[in-house]
């Protein structure tokens, strides 16, 4: 396909148009009084959401050059979401602010490479200052506040705090749809291990790139499956029952993997294959743990079992299994309480007898997985559209809370970024262009608070002017229209979310500024379809 190329000013201006179109859509959602965005779906009802990354991913612009600019901003949002789990709208607002100001200066003749150095220098100083003013999460109330701010719901904040209290900060918390209209919490027996699907074609939810299996059978083996004939009789029996299957094996290779994938794509049955967790003897022990939890049997040579002779009653079962690219979560296994308790007692005895700190640590990890359970948040709503929107909010809140536990929290509502701006305002660059880059970041740090104020119906410049004269952590609470200490009021953001949003925004914006050429496809003109009944047109029988 032929290509079209734009250079210098024309290239950057086209990219910036795309940046603005995406950012102007996303930034309307920031803050407690942010608006919703309605997304058209290829089928079914439209989605209503205020989730930044969901909106960013859904935007596809007609102009190729503008679309590239939009996709770069979407990447900043996506990377922030991947690392911190929230802060996507903040990342988008910061990217637009840095890119806009930078483009003005490059157009006026500044050197983009010097500006980039200044942006990087100011970003590093800002991140260092964020860590200095960060607070550690020490109470259930603080966890509830972080989650409440992210989800704009006090009830959700308390629900997530309860979940973390029950399964621990590192515990497994999953989110499921409820059959009723109430959102509730339950704790069930479950386990998570660090192994993801062997093929992305096994996913059942393309938006979240995860596979969800309801009431599946679970084949547990330490063998490598390369010949599909070894498990064919078992598969046929599972298909007849209309059940799904999770395969936990040493590996699935050869003809076996593509055959399973093909049957999944054709809709013959739902199957996901993952590698067994751990290595060597620890792998065997972990497989035995999974077998106890799910009521299955480990198919291994040690017990004289062959794959081709495996029967349905040797498979484990669970109410639900969720597999991502990195992890597998088994919820509510069908194992008997006696078998699980016996396994727990055995591990406790090994911990007492072990003389190795490393072995003790690994045994304690196994025990925690068996005893900790899985907290399940059942999300309820009156309609399907409301359910999706509520689920997005709860997922963001859960990710925010985990981020706060990791790196602490800072004053929310954009206040921390303005506090950082005040602390590093005297930062100096080695050249005038580098100083320009530093000044661009300093101005951009106030963009989130300006937008939050504007979404609340206030003049962003007036709010910012007053905020810059306040002491640290005193900010504008858009939810109550009051000026107060944001930390004491419970308006807090995870440091990790704020840090990641700034770093990704600076990185993408700097790339935009240093772009000198953009290459895009030239759309080909499609030939007009021949009119019906035209002379010489072949008939259907040919």
Curated annotation (Swiss-Prot):
Compartments it resides in: Cytoplasm
Keywords of the record: ATP-binding, Chaperone, Cytoplasm, Isomerase, Nucleotide-binding
Record's protein name: Chaperonin GroEL
InterPro entries named among the record's database cross-references: Chaperonin_Cpn60_CS, Cpn60/GroEL, Cpn60/GroEL/TCP-1, GroEL-like_apical_dom_sf, GROEL-like_equatorial_sf, TCP-1-like_intermed_sf
Known catalytic reactions: ATP + H2O + a folded polypeptide = ADP + phosphate + an unfolded polypeptide
Organism listed in the record: Lactobacillus acidophilus (strain ATCC 700396 / NCK56 / N2 / NCFM)
One GO CC annotation: cytoplasm
EC numbers: 5.6.1.7
Encoding gene per record: groEL
Complex and partners: Forms a cylinder of 14 subunits composed of two heptameric rings stacked back-to-back. Interacts with the co-chaperonin GroES.
Residues given in the record as ATP binding sites: 29-32, 86-90, 413, 477-479, 493
One matching Pfam family: Cpn60_TCP1
PROSITE patterns listed in its UniProt record: CHAPERONINS_CPN60
Role of this protein: Together with its co-chaperonin GroES, plays an essential role in assisting protein folding. The GroEL-GroES system forms a nano-cage that allows encapsulation of the non-native substrate proteins and provides a physical environment optimized to promote and accelerate protein folding.
Keyword Chaperone: yes
Chaperone listed as a keyword: yes
Biological-process GO terms, alphabetical: protein refolding
UniProt similarity note: Belongs to the chaperonin (HSP60) family.
UniProt superkingdom: Bacteria
GO MF terms held by the record: ATP binding; ATP-dependent protein folding chaperone; isomerase activity; unfolded protein binding
